[in-house]
Amino acid sequence: MNGAARTWGVVLAAGEGTRLASLTRDLAGNAVPKQFCSLNGGSSLLQDAIQRARQVVTPERTCAIVAKQHARHWRKALCSLPEENIIVQPQNRGTAHGVLLCVLSILERDPFARIIFLPADHFVLDESALQRSLRELATSLAHNPDGITLIGIAPDEPDPELGYIVPGRTLSDGSRTVARFVEKPAAPVADELVEKKALWNSFIFGATGPALLALLRLQLGTAVDEMATALAREVREADPAALAELYERLPSVDFSRSVVQQFPSRLRVITAPACGWTDLGTPRRVAETVRRLIEQAPTPTPARCRLRPWTSHGLINLAAQHARLSLAG
């Protein structure tokens, strides 16, 4: 089996999106996680991420991790995925445990899997440009079998709410070593990192399943074996609640801070070309992205259309919600 055939894609879609809750209220006043919303009236961010993954991995190896409590949102959105490719997290215990759940689930099916992770809350203006980096990432995993390869983005400005990658020397495959990784630094440190040509961490990354498992074991300890036991077929059949019971005991652990930041020597980075990438984590970033879209549109969108709070498929329109709140304020 060749390397491409063993590459899996996982869309990270289990977050609550609390920082964007002001824009994601449904008619009942409940906050809908942003990945189940549309940026500007089209498909949901989750559906966009699934399509992004399918440009680099086969549909049969495209997975998503979701939260059990969001089932009413993701059941319809993920109807095109095989049921076994929907990895359900009992509750949120941080991205490190979410990544671990994905790795163990995939390695059970493919012990030599290479896995690419893509967040479900990104907007990309030029998808074809990012696809080049995703293909490069998939290829690079053969050259970094024991570490993690990240996709970095040249920053527009200092932003303390993102992670930063300080690249090192260039390697034979075109990727670069990582001299330093800093997750969500203080504002003065973010300023300094941008001056030093650091890259934003897109949180799009890839690694072999065994390499990820080894790094996670160093930081999560016995939780790795406990989760592997809970996921074993015979345990699932005898005690379906075993995984949920384990999650009740797990602490919340952030993958970027507790795993990626701790092992810079095991990291590689690929710099994405200019592609209009945005992490839609805050209302400010939503507003900036919508402004760019309006400026670059060949035909201006009528204001009445931009203010429609729901898409034709019943999704919350983040751009419209932001515009309405701005007018109300």
Regions found by a protein language model. Give the residues of each.
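Conserved N-terminal catalytic core of the sugar/cofactor nucleotidyltransferase
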Residues: 1-14, 19-26, 30-33, 38-131, ...
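Left-handed beta-helix
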Residues: 1-6, 207-329
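Structural motif
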Residues: 9-10, 61-63, 85, 114-116, ...
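Hydrophobic packing residues within well-ordered alpha-helices of enzyme cores
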Residues: 20, 74-75, 190, 212, ...
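A short acidic, often aromatic-flanked loop/helix-cap motif at beta-alpha or helix-coil junctions
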Residues: 44, 92-97, 157-159, 187-188, ...
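Conserved core of the sugar-phosphate nucleotidyltransferase
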Residues: 58, 126-250, 267
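A conserved hydrophobic position in a structured secondary element of the catalytic/binding core
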Residues: 66, 118, 185, 207, ...
